[in-house]
Design a protein with these regions (language model features):
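Alpha-helical multipass membrane-protein architecture
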Residues: 2-831
Length: 831
């Protein structure tokens, strides 16, 4: 079964040192990949003129104060806007000080971003360098092909490894510079199309295009549709052919892209949609292309440049990970209390990091801290605090009460596990409830067992229900007026500096995205109706309503907090009730309903990245679309090759461990939700029926917090976000409370204590430290995997790799009551 998804100081710098150098005009020679409809010839280099000083404005002081009032109203409950800045806005409005109002307006709305995090890493000017070049397209497509193929192949292996976009961002830089050394600087004319293989030095805009292509191809992991296809082909014995596979895979990706484009006025253009993860990419782009040193007067005395610091930390992280990754694996989950009492059930339940509550969050492994949830240095402090609040309230306090009271037969089950269990305490054997045709056998189910979940897994489902209702109410209350205003104003909404700079370029039209979306929907109808999928066309209509309804609310939350809420549980829940007993329909419903929205969020994040880096929107449109379609073709081709050529692929005893873990999990989920169905798990009379109350809890609590925030707008209530409290824990399981606590401790250290005490250092180095730690870890992981795991090398055989894991917690045996052979627990009659 799938797990449910998942102070500042006064800082208005004009960044006088960053108005942009005087570059000579460069005329771009575009590489026409599609028709000229998607591209335009760039006009002559257009250096952006610095915005006039406050006193040079033509608008009256009254107009500026009115603009400030509108700004204050829109950002009154904005958790990312520093209170000091909001206080100054309020003071200017209250005193009617027009001159001060003009100064503040320019600082907050015209001259730069109102958010210090964005000001720290995103330049408030545009440099005219080419982005749509042969160099960018060739490097991007090659890396897209290699990354897609390698990731697809190794996703079939357990353990698996993946080439991430951080790796692409790193290796694309030397490849681009190497291209400059090899290719000639001359203009070519092929059938009337003119282009230059080396139109100047490899630049950061080309770099962004390459990374955007990789993000579109596999930024969210391998193509999710391949899990459905593997489950269908290998475990259910169905094969509808290559046409079905390609259309299914491409429509999943491109439906999300169409939605992302249509939603960009809500999720990309507004300054408040900061997309924190993009700030790390921006910092790394500028670091790789600019090796200048820092100004000690602005960085708490540090003069080391970002580039040099990145190399030092990245190399250090690369070398260090050999210890927790191979030499002393006990450093990962440093549960020393369990080492002292390895056979004590209560100790292992309370302090165990694998299956317990993990109330001793000490780790020396960055992969534990960032591997599941992402780097804790990225989300703003209030987001980290909300996630930790949800962990402590529900997964520690409430969960302990439930577990140690024996509710939901918890005495027979571990505190946490991503597995489902039968009434003998064993992992649920789905093959026992299927007939020879892999269809649900109710008689066999009644003779076998109902399905049971660990306490944390059950709690995670309840919180997932709460998150889905909370996000709609929260966004409606906190952002409803802004959404409606942006809808009415379309592209003519009030601009920040980055939006004004982007208006230099012709936009990708709304109707392009609309045509793409409608085309993908039409093809999807053909996919579900043209083959015997058991997926009714009317159910597909319901399926597509989910991402349409939830994309903007969930996207707003992610753009503000860096926390993504998932629709996986909701899609499983709905299809299980609508079309019970059809596993393939369940898998396809989940793929179109959940993954389309998830892909739309990844595309939106990349569109914001292009927005920050001033890449022409039409170049972003074409590069992401081409990369998505090509990547789907590559991954499906590799999948078919692997299934047909690798002996015993997807079997648990496959000699090289190509056991298809993702496809196997998807198959199990299809049986549980598509065959057993949610009615037998959550409806009246079922063990977990009480979890349905979380829908109401999720809908009610945002109203309470909103009323409190309205009454005390500058109190702690402005930072409370109930969707993040409920849904920020969506990766638990397979993540654990221990992992979340370790993540939270590091996040609070950097984004609260260091940010408040050493603000200049934090603004200059925080995001590049995050990128360096992640890059060093990823490169080290890849090297260890390819040199040691693939060669079946033996790990060092000592206590740090053996004895540290010989505890009840790691063995999954920290259980209060054990059954004798033949005994069962739970009711003998069940739904």
């Amino acid at each position: 079964m799938d797990a449910p998804d998942g102070q500042a100081r006064r800082l208005w710098p004009h960044r006088n040192g960053h108005r942009g150098p005087s570059h000579p005009a460069q005329v771009e020679q575009p590489f026409i990949m599609v028709r000229s409809l998607f591209f335009r010839k760039r006009h002559e280099a257009e250096e952006i003129t610095p915005i006039p000083g406050p006193l040079e404005s033509n608008a009256s002081g009254v107009d500026h104060l009115q603009h400030l009032q509108q700004f204050e109203k829109a950002h009154k409950l904005d958790p990312n806007l520093p209170i000091d800045e909001l206080n100054d806005v309020d003071a200017a409005i209250a005193t009617g000080n027009a001159e001060k109002g003009i100064e503040i307006e320019h600082a907050l709305m015209e001259d730069n971003s109102p958010y210090p995090e964005v000001r720290a890493v995103v330049r408030n000017y545009d440099v005219d360098v080419p982005a749509n070049t042969v160099r960018a397209w060739v490097i991007g497509l090659i890396l897209c092909t290699i990354g897609s193929g390698v990731n697809m192949l190794f996703s079939l292996r357990n353990p698996s490894v993946a080439i991430t976009t951080y790796v692409i961002q790193l290796i694309a830089y030397p490849i681009g510079r190497g291209w400059d050394l090899i290719m000639p600087d001359r203009e070519f004319n092929v059938f009337g199309l003119k282009f230059n293989l080396r139109p100047g030095k490899f630049n950061y805009k080309e770099h962004v295009v390459i990374v955007a292509m990789s993000n579109a191809a596999y930024g969210g992991g391998v193509l999710y549709a391949t899990d459905v296809l593997i489950a269908q082909k290998v475990f259910y014995g169905q094969d509808f052919g290559i046409a079905f596979q390609l259309l299914f895979g491409i429509t999943t990706l491109c439906t999300g892209y169409g939605l992302a484009g249509l939603a960009r006025r809500f999720l990309v253009w507004p300054a408040a949609m900061i997309w924190p993860a993009d700030l790390v990419n921006c910092a790394l782009f500028y670091t790789l292309h600019d090796h200048s040193i820092s100004d000690p007067s602005k960085t708490n005395g540090w003069s080391i440049g970002r580039y040099r610091l990145f190399l030092i930390i990245g190399c250090g992280a690369f070398i260090y990970y050999w210890f927790p990754g191979w030499i002393f694996r006990g450093l990962s989950v440093f549960a020393w209390v369990c080492w002292i009492a390895p056979n004590n059930v209560v100790v292992n339940k309370v302090f165990g990091g694998q299956h317990g509550y993990g109330l001793m969050p000490i780790t020396f492994d960055w992969s534990i801290i960032s591997g599941f949830i992402g780097s804790p240095l990225i989300p703003p402090f209030h987001a980290t605090a909300n996630v930790l609040g949800g962990i402590i309230i529900f997964f520690v306090c409430v969960s302990m009460g439930i577990h140690f009271s024996g509710t939901w037969f918890a005495d027979y089950l571990p505190v946490q596990s991503s597995e489902s269990y039968d009434n003998m305490g064993n992992i649920y054997n789905v093959s026992r409830i299927l007939d020879a045709n892999f269809e649900f056998n109710e008689t066999a189910y009644k003779e076998y067992s109902p399905l049971y979940l660990s306490t944390q897994f059950a709690m995670a489902y309840g919180l997932s229900f709460a998150a889905m209702s909370a996000v709609i109410i929260h966004v409606g209350l906190y952002h409803g007026k802004e959404i409606w205003r942006q809808f009415k104003m379309a592209r003519h909404q009030e601009d920040d500096v980055h939006m004004r700079l982007m208006k230099k370029y012709r936009d990708a039209e709304d109707w392009w995205y609309a045509v793409l979306f409608v085309t993908m929907v039409a093809i999807s109808f053909g996919v579900v109706a043209g083959w015997p999928t058991g997926f009714p066309a009317w159910a597909y209509v319901v399926c597509m309503m989910l991402p349409i309804i939830w994309l903007i609310p969930i996207g707003l939350i992610q753009a503000i907090t860096n926390i993504q809420l998932g629709l996986n549980v909701l899609t499983e829940f709905i299809i299980g009730y609508m079309v019970p007993g059809r596993p393939l329909a369940m898998m396809m419903f989940k793929n179109y309903g959940y993954i389309s929205m998830s892909q739309a969020l990844y595309f939106s994040q990349d569109l914001k990245l292009g927005h920050y880096m001033k890449v022409p929107p039409r170049v972003m449109f074409a590069s992401q679309l081409v990369a998505s379609i090509w990547s789907a073709m590559v991954q499906i081709g590799v999948m078919n090759w692997a299934v047909s050529k690798i002996p015993d692929v997807c079997s648990l005893d496959q000699p090289n461990n190509y056991s298809c873990p993702n496809g196997r999990v998807f198959y199990t989920a299809s049986v549980v939700w598509g065959a057993i169905g949610p009615a037998r798990i959550f409806s009246h009379g079922a063990t977990y029926a009480s979890l349905q109350w979380f829908w109401l809890v999720g809908a009610a609590t945002p109203i309470i917090t909103w009323l409190l925030a309205r009454r005390w707008p500058k109190s702690i209530w402005r930072y409370v976000c109930t969707p993040v409290i409920y849904g920020g824990t969506g990766l638990l399981p397979p993540a654990t409370v221990y992992i979340f606590l370790c993540w939270g401790v590091v996040g609070i250290t950097f984004n609260y204590f260091i940010k408040r005490r050493y603000t200049g250092w934090w603004l200059q180095y925080n995001y590049i430290v995050s990128a360096a730690l992640d890059c060093g870890l990823i490169l080290s992981t890849l090297l260890i995997f390819f040199t040691l795991y693939l060669t079946s090398a033996n790990k060092p055989n000592w206590w740090g790799n053996v004895g540290a894991f010989q505890t009840l917690d790691f063995e999954g045996k920290a259980i209060t009551r054990h059954l004798m052979p033949g005994e069962t627990f739970g009711p003998s009659v069940f739904p």
